[in-house]
Design a protein with these regions (language model features):
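Glycan-recognition and catalytic cores of secretory/periplasmic carbohydrate-active enzymes
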Residues: 1-269
Length: 269
């Protein structure tokens, strides 16, 4: 249990699932669980957990209101078994309670707890849906592959089709910020915003440089899960269309290929 971090004061796990995290870190923590369907698919406790975990994102658990079934969006980039984080995240939310850094090999090079906090100062924008949440489709996929229960496939289709529509409105490019009212980019239309989004280049406190930390490739998992359960190539086509859209903005500068910032006027149909 944590002392300072709200999400962990009653334990970092609840109902066998992380209370609140983003889907890069949820995904890293669930690598073994996501493979259990290949080895013990009939194990009762695995089946029960697969369905329970999926329910956290299907509006089935009132303690985990992560999903808006009307707007078909996950309400925050930080989510889990205790629901979404619906405020700006603090560095402490990301790092956790103070700890002794000595003895740990920090991948980003931090040597003090203060540097860990400084690393996450700019990671505050998390409210609203985010392409990183497409990784959450893995949970209903796990549940669907057990006995082909239609509701799991339908949720994947509904959620991913909503993202296809957002990409269509955004000239083929997947946005990294969808507001709680469903508006792409929020009131200002800044679709590239949010932590881990297209325009996310925070300062690394170890070297003082801005470093690109978008997590666009993780969204592919959602499209591959939708392709797996439906067989429809439109989910693969979305990725191809986006690559074409990005590459169409490429130009050569000093012998190197660069992509200019996209000026996208959202088409609301």
């Amino acid at each position: 249990k944590t002392t300072d971090v709200p999400a962990g004061r009653e334990g970092m796990y609840y109902k066998d699932f992380s209370t609140q995290s983003d889907w890069m870190h949820h995904g890293e923590g669930m690598q073994n669980f996501n493979r259990m369907g290949l080895s013990v698919p009939t194990l009762p406790i695995y089946q029960e957990r697969a369905r329970r975990f999926a329910g956290f994102y299907m509006a089935e658990d009132p303690e985990a209101p992560n999903y808006d079934p009307k707007l078909k969006l996950i309400r925050s980039m930080i989510n889990g078994s205790r629901g979404p984080l619906l405020r700006k995240a603090t560095a402490l939310d990301w790092v956790g309670d103070p700890f002794d850094v000595q003895g740990f090999g920090a991948l980003h090079g931090e040597s003090t707890f203060e540097q860990f906090l400084a690393h996450y100062v700019e990671y505050s924008d998390v409210v609203g849906d985010h392409f990183l949440n497409l990784v959450a489709t893995t949970l209903p996929t796990n549940a669907y592959l057990l006995k082909n229960e239609p509701k799991y496939k339908q949720w994947i289709v509904d959620y991913m089709d909503a993202w296809l529509e957002r990409m269509k409105q955004n000239k083929g490019i997947i946005p990294s910020h969808v507001a709680l009212d469903g508006k792409i980019g929020g009131a200002d239309g800044q679709w590239w915003k949010s932590a881990y989004g297209w325009g996310f280049s925070p300062v690394n406190p170890v070297n003082g440089r801005r470093e690109n930390r978008n997590r666009i490739p993780r969204a592919v998992i959602g499209f591959t899960n939708a392709l797996l359960v439906t067989g429809k190539q439109k989910y693969s086509d979305a990725g191809r269309t986006m690559i074409d859209s990005v590459n169409s903005r490429a130009r050569t500068v000093d012998g190197q290929t660069v992509v200019q910032e996209a000026e996208v006027e959202i088409d609301e149909g």
